[in-house]
Design a protein with these regions (language model features):
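N-terminal auxiliary interaction/assembly segments of multi-subunit proteins
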Residues: 1-153
């Protein structure tokens, strides 16, 4: 993975979350994990293509997702309805769009694909060789984990 992708991805992510949540976002410690270590109730991936191949995986627990949906829509969600899942996918899309623009501004060439949800089994069988940089972000809605997985073409 090219490390120069990580900083613009994280800066863009923090800006989007700050804008959406209107509160301070704190970054936890960066760690290198394997796909099978992603563990949460919800995971949404935005695949990236171009100079490198990979994706941004945003994962979180159920309560965090519901809290984010409440903030983003102004409605009170009590269950992970299709609208709630679409809201989390849209947040992931906003993160990926801003991050891709920031990386492309550095002279790289990336495009994003539409978001898709993943099961833990799909993560484990999709690319067992993949290295993932995981960064926990602490928000007023709960912990969101940003996972960056890229392979140079």
């Amino acid at each position: 993975m090219r490390y120069e992708y990580i900083e613009p991805l994280l800066i863009s992510t923090m800006k989007v979350l700050d804008n959406v949540m209107q509160s301070e976002i704190r970054m936890g410690d960066v760690s290198l994990i394997r796909p099978e270590e992603i563990n949460s109730d919800i995971a949404v991936i935005i695949k990236l293509e171009g100079d490198s191949t990979g994706g941004i995986i945003v994962n979180m627990g159920r309560e965090t997702a519901l809290n984010i949906c409440n903030v983003m829509t102004g409605e009170k969600f009590k269950a992970l309805t299709p609208l709630a899942l679409d809201t989390i996918s849209e947040l992931t899309n906003m993160i990926a769009g801003n991050a891709t623009s920031a990386i492309n501004d550095l002279g790289f060439d990336f495009k994003i694909l539409p978001p898709s949800s993943l099961t833990k089994e799909e993560m484990m069988t999709g690319a067992p060789w993949l290295e993932i940089f995981q960064v926990p972000l602490l928000t007023r809605c709960g912990e969101i984990k940003i996972n960056i997985a890229m392979r140079t073409n």
